[in-house]
Amino acid sequence: MGIDPETFPVHSIPGLTVGTGLKMALIAVGCGILSILFCILLKTVGQLYAKYLKNPYIRIAVAAGVIILITICLNTKDYMGAGSGLIARAIEKGEARPLDFLWKMLLTALTMRAGYRGGEIVPAFSIGATFGCVAGGILGFSPELAAAASMVALFCGVTNCPITAMLISFELFGFSGAAYYLIAISISYAVSGYYSLYKDQTIVYSKYKARYINRKTR
């Protein structure tokens, strides 16, 4: 139909060395931890809503007021919507504010668990991309590459889908940074443990041993 797929060319890709590999691994550990925090935040906000705002209409109205107030205080609409603008800026320009990923996490949880419809996947992408961009800048690593790798690493951490994350990275970013994407995805997958966005997801085999566990995610 003549529709081109979305791609984000990553131009600043350093050669893989022990130093760059370790920096990528450190960022990936951060993505795994952030994956856990995101899952816990979503669950906790949902529980608080259910406890203190049992009426769904009041809950939605109160949540809307809180979200609008936070947006006015922050003086930006960057955290509204799925977060595609944050993703593009982080990967294409290597730009992200230090707290972008935290505000996006909070506002996503407040919105989704209040009852507004949408998905967590693209917001998870934007959280990962902005975190990676900031972490890359701190570590003296390519912010663009760190944003791309962290985007799929955090996605893997919250969904427990490493193969899907790998294929998404190749489709969106190409194969030039494949080694970094694989490092980030594998480490985030291990660090994130058995947390997930999906409460009914089942992990059949242990992430750490060749053992059948057949357990539900947290």
List the predicted regions and their residue ranges.
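Alpha-helical transmembrane segments and immediately membrane-proximal extracytoplasmic
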Residues: 1-218
